[in-house]
Amino acid sequence: MEYPAPLSSAVLITRYKRFLADVTLEDGSQTTLHCPNTGSMKNCLYPGKRVWFSTSDNPKRKYAHTWELAEDDRGNLIGINTARANQLAEEAIGLGQISELQGYNQIRREVKYGNENSRIDLLLSEGQAPDCYIEVKSCTLLDHDWGLFPDAVSTRGQKHLRELMEMKRQGYRAVLLFVVQHQGIHRVAPAEAIDPKYAALLREAIAAGVEVLAYGCMMNNKGLQLNIPIPFHPDAG
């Protein structure tokens, strides 16, 4: 996935009100970025470190700049725009870069499914084969070289696991795909200490036949590419 134009860089001052971040530009002036991440961004916020942002030409936007990448204290890049996760997953599947999800000829987004008024991130179809329901999760919480999910208690994430189990029970393929947007993450696990209910439900889902995949990104100021398989460990978080 290429950005419409190379990202611009700045230095982070602070993030506040969840959706805003103040930064210092290269010319020394300050501006406010839109922060497209509603999570805690635990271990992703490093005041004084570099960030990268895209710029919209939409005159109706209050904040023209969108925060895309951050840098941690070890120089790792972090993709903080959670909306990119679904885009990356769809592109990678369409290009055949996720081997476990090859062989489907149709990809649909945001299709209603399940018993709890949900919409699936991606629904794959191929002839007479069972449909494949995919929930996509962005993983950026780093603990040593582990990526943990979620970074806060997630009742929504718990609901999605229940929905995936129901789809599997009905005979479909059900997949949880972690899109790892942090260069320092080399293994993924549920965040047991943060959301033990989610961790337990995830193990229950695996036992019920839900598949779990994790893939990492190549990233720079020109774009992102999801193509690096990462091991998942259901009991290690």
Swiss-Prot record:
- Identify the Gene3D superfamilies for this entry: 2.40.50.580, 3.40.1350.60
* CDD domains assigned to the protein according to its UniProt record, in alphabetical order: SfsA-like_bacterial
Q: Cite the GO molecular-function annotations of the record.
A: DNA binding
Kindly list the residue ranges recorded as spanning the membrane: none
UniProt xrefs under InterPro entries: SfsA, SfsA_C, SfsA_N
Q: One Pfam family this chain carries?
A: SfsA
Which protein family is it in?
Belongs to the SfsA family.
In terms of PANTHER family, this protein maps to:
SUGAR FERMENTATION STIMULATION PROTEIN A
Matching entries from NCBIfam families are given as: sfsA
State what protein this is by name: Sugar fermentation stimulation protein homolog
Q: What is the lineage of its organism?
A: Bacteria, Pseudomonadati, Pseudomonadota, Gammaproteobacteria, Alteromonadales
Its gene name is sfsA
